[in-house]
Amino acid sequence: MGTAAVTAMILTDDIFHMFVFFEILALAQVGIVAASSIDYSYEMALKYMILGSIGSPMMLLGIGFLLALTVSVNVTDIATAVHMGLVDATSPVFLLSLGLIFFGWLYASGLPPFHTIKSGIYSKAEPHGAALLQSFTVISMISIVLIMYRIYSALPIFEVLVVFFSILAMILGVSLALTQTDFRRMIGFLAVGELGFIGLGIGLGTQYAITAGLFQALNEIIITALLFIGFGAIVNATNEVDTRKLGGLLAYHPKVSLMLLIGGLAMAGVPPLSGFQSKLMLVQASLSCGFPEISILAIMVSIATFVVFVKTFYAMFLRPKPNDLELEGKSVPKSMIFAMGVLLIIIVLLGIFPDVVTSGISNFVGGIL
């Protein structure tokens, strides 16, 4: 159901249908969390639904204001009316519609102020479920913001808002990840921070920047899937999520350890992995737009992400094993190792041959600008 919903969100040119499919997706996300066997998963699913009862109606109200102004819910018709001056882009109703839909987008994306609940649902889902949740979040985030871009790009405040909340997500995501001892929460906060990089590219607004943002989105889906599955494998082998109670795992699970290390380096933007290529493009895009301070911030966040992974990797894999930690005879399912291996190959290939993907993304972006 979730896959069908995000596919429909990508394909639709009707903003009301987009909202309907987003609601279906939200139900699927709640179901994935509630079906988990992890403690307090029901509580987290309920919290997500309660917040959804605030964010979703606001988005729908914003769509209603657009309908009142343009007498249409077709995105192309609305965008044409706005850019041809048939709708006053400075009218209070139009600006209010932007604010309401933007608030709904923040909820859908898990950007601040919804970053804690989004990272929470990741930590309460099964590993494969968390990977699905993150992919759903990334795709819905892109689908909604591209629709908003087509409608509101004439307003300078739109791009400012996207960049501001994206930067806020980057800073809060990595800052909160540094404080975590539960590695599932740590990955959840880092995943939210990486969403900020995606929003940053789209908010800068140039073809190259949006291409970089969409390439970052693809990398985000693949890299976080590898990390969620890898850390899920560690939970499967140790029944433990607290990094303070782990250690010495490198000797017992070297394959998982190596693949998690490479995945962490990819998320931090270390060459020649795929995360480096997309973040390099984002830094270049920021410089070309005249914002060197954003480029510096992106580099600093990437360095902080690297520090998070070095700290976590040492705690879990390199330091001596605690005496009360039982690891003998506990293996990781081969299916998890296989899935991680496939994702790792894709990460390496995209890092070495980024043009295979970026050229197609650039053509797509050129078609919507």
PLM region spans:
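Interfacial segments of multi-pass membrane proteins
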Residues: 32, 82, 122, 149, ...
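Short helix-boundary/re-entrant hairpin motifs in multi-pass inner-membrane proteins
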Residues: 95-161, 188-189, 255
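Predominantly late transmembrane helices and immediately cytosolic-facing juxtamembrane segments
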Residues: 112, 224-230, 293-328
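Membrane-interface alpha-helices at helix entry/exit sites of multi-pass transporters
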Residues: 44-47, 124-135, 241-257, 291-301, ...
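Cytoplasmic/organellar membrane-interface segments at the starts of transmembrane helices
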Residues: 253-255, 310-369
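Alpha-helical multi-pass transmembrane bundles of energy-transducing inner-membrane proteins
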Residues: 5-93, 107, 176-242
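Alpha-helical transmembrane segments of multipass membrane proteins
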Residues: 4-11, 31-32, 65, 102, ...
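Alpha-helical transmembrane segments and their membrane-interface junctions
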Residues: 149-152, 264-282, 344-365
